[in-house]
Amino acid sequence: MEILNGPSGWIEVICGGMYSGKSEELIRRVRRAQIAKQKVQVFKHSLDIRYDKDYVASHTGLKIEAIPVSSSADIERLVEDDTQVVAIEEGQFFDMGIVKVCQRLADKGKRVIVAGLDQDFRGEPFGPMPYLMAVAEYVDKLHAICMKCGNVASRTQRIIDGKPAYYDDPIILVGAFETYEARCRNCHIVLRRDENEK
């Protein structure tokens, strides 16, 4: 990745399906900035309580301290003037205001790193993530391995009682291995109630 010189900030987006390593990559970038003695603030959406409410945690056990917030306005209010790097976990859970907040922070010369799911369990664009990807200087799409066939997985399969979820189920359901699997395009299934009732 080429780093821009000067006071200009920028936005980096780390996206992909579940189990693709997004949180690990966010943690890696934050730790590199900390080693370089840059002031970093890490935020995560308060909906994410899977492992620890005060940490960004990967499925593999890596973790880093974070400030839980419930809106993009909270991030903008809490970012300190001398912060150089702002890291945001679970970008898909935030309101659409997160796009403008990230742009304003980058305009102030800050490096903004956002990690999140680019698609919901239906395989459709998730919340503000596609808009963040559009305005970011750098976008990295990570992939997992399909838990059915071993191919490259770009989607997240929601499993309820051992079966794929229905299209009209709620978009947000926080969970991990007990609720979601990494799937490729061919193995990803979303049931529709009318099809199932025939």
Curated annotation (Swiss-Prot):
The protein's name in its UniProt record: Thymidine kinase
Gene Ontology biological process terms from the UniProt entry: DNA biosynthetic process; thymidine metabolic process
Annotated compartments: Cytoplasm
EC number: 2.7.1.21
Binding site for ATP: 16-23, 89-92
Alphabetized Gene3D superfamilies for the sequence: 3.30.60.20, P-loop containing nucleotide triphosphate hydrolases (3.40.50.300)
Residues annotated as the enzyme's active site: 90
